[in-house]
Amino acid sequence: MLNEFKAFIARGNVMDLAVGVIIGGAFGGIVKSLVDDLIMPIVGAIFGGFDFSNYFLPLSAAVNAQSLAAAREQGAVFAYGSFLTVLINFLILAWIIFLMVKGVNTMRAQIERQEKAAPEELPPPPADVQLLTEIRDLLARRPTA
């Protein structure tokens, strides 16, 4: 059973999946930075300078802080702003992945169409076969006596 597991892990598909997960994790960081550092400040500037990540509702009377980090130290909070930020991250990531998959599928379909459209040319027959074909044709045209 251990050998089967080793064979399974060593197969290309599992290794490809592992690489994909690692790259996906790194890509997630890029998307998070895109949202947090570029998109959310623009949204904040357009809609009056607010930042979703600090939006929360206190769930106890002891919470009176103005920032989410301080409010979490004081007690329970409903941090809906953090959820909105994560939701925006997800939507951007899903959109980018959709566009990538759509592009790959379009390229595959185009390659398949080109392969179907291009007639498969047979290589010319060897010289001896061409010579024998010419002799056969000459003999066939010769009058029989």
UniProtKB/Swiss-Prot annotation:
The identity of this protein, by name, is Large-conductance mechanosensitive channel
**Organism of derivation:** Rhizobium johnstonii (strain DSM 114642 / LMG 32736 / 3841)
Predominant place of localization: membrane
The similarity annotation says: Belongs to the MscL family.
Annotated membrane-spanning segments are: 14-34, 38-58, 81-101
The Swiss-Prot or TrEMBL record annotates one GO molecular function as: mechanosensitive monoatomic ion channel activity
Q: Where in the cell is it found?
A: Cell inner membrane
Quaternary structure annotation from Swiss-Prot or TrEMBL? Homopentamer.
Q: What does this protein do?
A: Channel that opens in response to stretch forces in the membrane lipid bilayer. May participate in the regulation of osmotic pressure changes within the cell.
Q: Which Pfam families match?
A: MscL
Q: Which UniProt keywords apply?
A: Cell inner membrane, Cell membrane, Ion channel, Ion transport, Membrane, Transmembrane, Transmembrane helix, Transport
* Disulfide bond residue pairs: none
Q: Which GO terms describe its cellular component?
A: plasma membrane
> What is the recorded membrane topology of this protein?
Multi-pass membrane protein
